[in-house]
Amino acid sequence: MLALLGPNGAGKTTTIEILEGFRMRSAGRVEVLGVDLADGTEQWRARVGSVLQSWRDHGKWRVRELLAHLGSYYACYCTELVKRPWDANELLAVAGLTEHADKKIKMLSGGQRHRLDVAIGIVGRPELLFLDEPTAGFDPAARREFHDLVHGLAEQYGTTILLTTHDLNEAEKLAGRILILNGGRVIADGTAEELAQRIAGEDEVRWTRDGQHFVQSTTESTRFAFELFKQYGESIADLEVRRSSLVHQVEAGQSATAEANDYEEVAR
């Protein structure tokens, strides 16, 4: 599972829409499952599933009926290796919706509706599933249930998943690999552990002195602050220590491997 992590406006949705084939690239080459999107056929599209941030409601449909109907469009793309579509009853069980099979969609709760969205996204047994901000607006319980569902798809059924999120905890919990985006560019790439190691110890100390603002990156923020007060005393104001974290890297729009600008104030 791969997570595209970044703040609002970083380019996550634009990136995933290009990969899904919903938006044209402005330049370069984009391949998904070995196919240039400009040459993507219906056979290729049957190998890809998507769960969007928003949907057009099918409130009058019953859950099982809608899955069976949508699944029927994939039957002609069945192969010896991949039997399409997913059986509606089996899919309901996978998505945790069996007891709601005969409900009208408008009667589902928000969490149940998002489970149905995922079921719709995988009804054709895609090799690759795109999830765009899938847990936006979820309460903690619904978020945990959704995480369990996504984990099951990846681990039990071998579905490759690419999701976008601005939630670092979600990215760390779900993804084996994280790409951090900012301003439409990838500024970091690796596992959560690898990214954390790259910035380990690089705290950022901010302060003002005589009306001037200063910033210092250091691996020993406590000692640095002590020496700062030792040298300048009460003239130091607005002291702030920002501990190193991936969240800070995303918010600051910096590369996890780049060094922060160094404005040294302490005399050597």
For each predicted feature, which ranges?
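ABC ATPase "signature
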Residues: 189-190
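Helix-to-loop junction immediately C-terminal to a conserved catalytic motif
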Residues: 20
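Helical segment within the ABC ATPase nucleotide-binding domain
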Residues: 144-157
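Catalytic Walker B motif of ABC-type/P-loop ATPase nucleotide-binding domains
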Residues: 129-132
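Conserved ABC ATPase "signature" region
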Residues: 68, 72-75, 82-100
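Short, charged/small-residue-rich alpha-helical element at the C-terminal edge
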Residues: 194-268
